[in-house]
């Protein structure tokens, strides 16, 4: 399938999820992450904050478990820059105040900026992924550009509410592939 078709199809599927279904899948994603990855060994994790109107996975479940059980792991979140093209990355603590930006993405008001080369792992938002590790996001390229700024050994993990499609037909060389993708049913390794 083509990315544009996958975006439409997966957004429709996501919006059809009930609150309870989304909550159950989000819990399962958290359980899979902590079961299959040594989260406590990471120093810095970059994670997206969920946009409620998009029915994104509730990454707060992951963040709160890290704060409770992995006190040495620091969390950073993206902040969309005014140019609408780039991200910067800010340290998130339990006391960090957040506001929603123009796209209703929660972002830190004022927080320590963290360089992309700092991260050991990145949890990536996506609408779809394929069996080769390619992902389909919202189409702005934020994460492809960001991942190129990270260390080559950064672990790239997608969080998906749906299983993979066989192949994304218009994946291209500039797409940064995943190392793994977590679904509520299993972890896909690439």
Which positions does each model-derived feature cover?
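Short glycine-rich anion-binding loops that position phosphate/pyrophosphate groups of nucleotides
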Residues: 50-53, 127-131
């Amino acid at each position: 399938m083509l990315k544009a078709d996958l975006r439409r199809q997966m957004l429709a599927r996501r919006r059809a999820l009930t609150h309870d279904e989304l909550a159950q899948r989000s819990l399962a994603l958290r359980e899979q992450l902590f079961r299959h990855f040594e989260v406590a060994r990471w120093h810095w994790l970059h994670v997206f904050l969920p946009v409620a109107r998009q029915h994104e996975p509730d990454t707060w479940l992951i963040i709160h478990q890290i704060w409770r059980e992995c006190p040495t792991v620091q969390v950073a979140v993206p902040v969309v820059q005014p140019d609408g093209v780039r991200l910067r990355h800010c340290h998130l603590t339990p006391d960090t105040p957040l506001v929603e930006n123009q796209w209703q993405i929660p972002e830190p008001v004022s927080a320590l900026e963290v360089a992309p080369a700092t991260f050991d792992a990145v949890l990536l938002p996506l609408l779809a992924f394929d069996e080769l590790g390619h992902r389909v996001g919202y189409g702005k390229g934020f994460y492809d550009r960001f991942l190129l700024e990270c260390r080559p050994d950064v672990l790239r993990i997608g969080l998906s509410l749906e299983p993979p499609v066989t192949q994304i037909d218009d994946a291209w060389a500039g797409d940064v592939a995943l190392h793994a993708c977590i679904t509520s049913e299993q972890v896909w390794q690439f």
